[in-house]
Amino acid sequence: MTHKPCLLYSQLPAIDRLLREPQITPLVEQYGQTLVTATLRRMQEQARINIKQYQALPDWCDNWASALGQQLEQKQALALKPVFNLSGTVIHTNLGRALMAESAIEAVTQVMRSPVTLEYSLNNAERGHRDHALADLLCELTGAEDACIVNNNAAAVLLLLATVASGKQVVVSRGELVEIGGAFRIPDVMVQAGCRLVEVGTTNRTHLKDYRQAINEETALLMKVHTSNYNIDGFTAEVSGRELATLGIASQIPTAIDLGSGSMINMVQYGLPAEPMPQDYLNQGIDLVTFSGDKLLGGPQAGIILGKKHWIEAIQRHPLKRALRADKMTLAALEATLRLYQRPEQLCQQLPTLRLLTRSQQQMHDMAQRLLPQLQAHYGDQFIVRDEPCYSQIGSGSLPVDRLPSWALTFAAVEGQGSSLERLARCWRGLAKPVLGRISGGRLWLDLRCLEDEKALLQALLL
């Protein structure tokens, strides 16, 4: 080791000395001595590596207190950061899907702060069942005989299959063997549930006779899967829920449908495209229906199974149910969300997801007009800033081919600055509250459909 590195190593202050510095004492009080000491040790190690590689101290060695404060702040920052979702996707899987209603937020806060009757009966002071209160509410809203709640819809499908058809055959149309995000595939779920898949029909056309011909003594379930994240047009045919239910009754084989997203209300009344409703399939005679809580329903992540009482009771008894059950926070948020559906005339105002989906294009246009002048003044030297019509998508596999007319602010790089859009997007992602748009067609788009606070967005972008 040369003389210079030796001198540099000797300039590294001892941990005890650093902890006694007046500028670091407040950090110890704020973050605790254990965390501060561990961070200082890591900083010392970083400095030693810098000396070894570059024969120089890091720049921050001139002010250990300031560098320590920055590292502690970064370390304590929450991993789940609030963001401005201006991506154009309303129910964005990567951004947490549905936003909670205020009543759901209050309900979660309450059950976090106090013991609650999660599995306790006040009537007889005995153990209760965590699903019963919500099951009654779901039955009231949908006409189902009974209901089961688990932690997501994938769990609902897995539990249903494991209960009804483990070791047996499940008949599904070839055109409905869906894959959703994260490589979640219906055939793979069947394998995990111990079922044997029997594909019938073709990719674009499946008839009732295809199901009928596949039935044998090993058939345990006739199943439909709603193709919520893609659509097949043209020369197509599919078996309706009523047809499948009729065949199931005649063959004494249960029937099920996985709706994926699903909606508890008729979306057409709000000017939105139609989405299958679980109560419709129950009315058609389908035995079991599964759907998500955090998509069009507008609630927390949850999987909901509705259907015939004897099948729901069997599902509740399955050992997997305990592994997949929902916790008290999920149940509280889901109950509060479902209670909003008891007052459908107020739903559009109280359910954030529905409110965002039903915003008129004129509302976003008006927002763009208010925001545009200040953004043009701030970014005009480097970017051409305009307001333009665009289309939002619902997201999370809901109504995949339908788009919602919206309005956006767009940023186009001036000539010769092609990489500046990526730099700008990266800069916005690094803000205290990141701003997330999308780059398309040589422009950075900020779709305003999900913008709730114009003032906060301007404060973020004009720094």
From Swiss-Prot:
The role this protein plays is: Converts seryl-tRNA(Sec) to selenocysteinyl-tRNA(Sec) required for selenoprotein biosynthesis.
Major localization class: cytoplasm
Source organism per entry reads Photorhabdus laumondii subsp. laumondii (strain DSM 15139 / CIP 105565 / TT01) (Photorhabdus luminescens subsp. laumondii)
One GO biological-process annotation of the entry reads: selenocysteine incorporation
Q: What EC number(s) does its UniProt record assign?
A: 2.9.1.1
GO molecular-function term, one example from the UniProt record: L-seryl-tRNA(Sec) selenium transferase activity
User: Part of which pathway?
Assistant: Aminoacyl-tRNA biosynthesis; selenocysteinyl-tRNA(Sec) biosynthesis; selenocysteinyl-tRNA(Sec) from L-seryl-tRNA(Sec) (bacterial route): step 1/1
Tell me which stretches of the chain form a coiled coil: none
User: What is a single cellular component term in the Gene Ontology annotation?
Assistant: cytoplasm
Q: Report if keyword Transferase is assigned.
A: yes
Modified-residue entries (N6-(pyridoxal phosphate)lysine), positions: K295
The protein's required cofactor(s) are namely: pyridoxal 5'-phosphate
Subunit info?
Homodecamer; pentamer of dimers. Binds only one seryl-tRNA(Sec) per dimer.
UniProt cross-references to NCBIfam families, sorted A to Z: selA
Name of the protein: L-seryl-tRNA(Sec) selenium transferase
Q: Which InterPro entries match?
A: PyrdxlP-dep_Trfase (IPR015424), PyrdxlP-dep_Trfase_major (IPR015421), SelA-like (IPR018319), SelA_trans (IPR004534), SelA_trans_N_dom (IPR025862)
